UniProtKB/Swiss-Prot annotation:
Protein name, per record: Trypsin inhibitor 5
A cellular-component GO term for this protein: extracellular region
Residue runs in coiled coils: none
Function, in words: Strongly inhibits trypsin, weakly inhibits chymotrypsin.
Positions marked as site (Reactive bond): 5-6
Alphabetic keyword roster: Disulfide bond, Knottin, Protease inhibitor, Secreted, Serine protease inhibitor
Amino acid sequence: RICPRILMECKADSDCLAQCICQESGFCG
């Protein structure tokens, strides 16, 4: 999957860019 390495806070996968997923840490990855 393609995930830009940009630190983004999230509550759901939809908060993240591209194919990033929301990790347990509360950040996209």
